[in-house]
């Protein structure tokens, strides 16, 4: 019984005190206006949860910053979209996260909305393999 209680307390401590914001492999749809279709590529991005809280009483002197799992460092990779017209620019550059942390969402470089379009959204409706 004590082992079960210890395990339960350990799980609660892990959920509250330890962030699990880490790199994860994802598949995203990339599209070029000139090519009129999308392709899927594999990349890494940040996923997980971060300890945060929403205060009941708002204090204007202390801003309430919600922490989210976001990138700390990025690199950019470029891929050639196959099957584009010869006159079209078929190069596409996309971000690859190399390090993650729990921090404030930077709306200048990230979609901080509650529910974005998602990584597999394709505005053309046609995916090529």
Swiss-Prot record:
Single Gene Ontology MF annotation? follicle-stimulating hormone activity
Signal sequence annotation: 1-20
Q: Where in the cell is it found?
A: Secreted
- Entry keywords, A to Z: Disulfide bond, Glycoprotein, Hormone, Secreted, Signal
| InterPro entries linked to this entry | Cystine-knot_cytokine, Glyco_hormone_CN, Gonadotropin_bsu, Gonadotropin_bsu_CS
**GO cellular component assignments:** cytoplasm; extracellular space; follicle-stimulating hormone complex
- Cite a single GO BP annotation: positive regulation of bone resorption
Say yes or no: keyword Heme present: no
The record, for Pfam families, names: Cys_knot
Q: Family per UniProt? A: Belongs to the glycoprotein hormones subunit beta family.
Subunit structure, briefly? Heterodimer. The active follitropin is a heterodimer composed of an alpha chain/CGA shared with other hormones and a unique beta chain/FSHB shown here.
Task: From the Swiss-Prot or TrEMBL record, give the protein name.
Answer: Follitropin subunit beta
Please give the organism.
Answer: Pan troglodytes
């Amino acid at each position: 019984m004590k082992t079960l209680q210890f395990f339960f307390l350990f799980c609660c401590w892990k959920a509250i005190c330890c962030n699990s914001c880490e790199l994860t492999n994802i598949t995203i749809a990339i599209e070029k206006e000139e090519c009129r279709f999308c392709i899927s590529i594999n990349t890494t991005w940040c996923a997980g949860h971060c300890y945060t809280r929403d205060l009941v009483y708002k204090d204007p002197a202390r801003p309430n910053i919600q922490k989210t799992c976001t990138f700390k460092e990025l690199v950019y990779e470029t891929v050639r979209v196959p099957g584009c017209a010869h006159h079209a620019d078929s190069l596409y550059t996309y971000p690859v996260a190399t390090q993650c942390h729990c921090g404030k969402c930077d709306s200048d470089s990230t979609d901080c909305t509650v529910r974005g379009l998602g990584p597999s959204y394709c505005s053309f409706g046609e995916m090529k393999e």
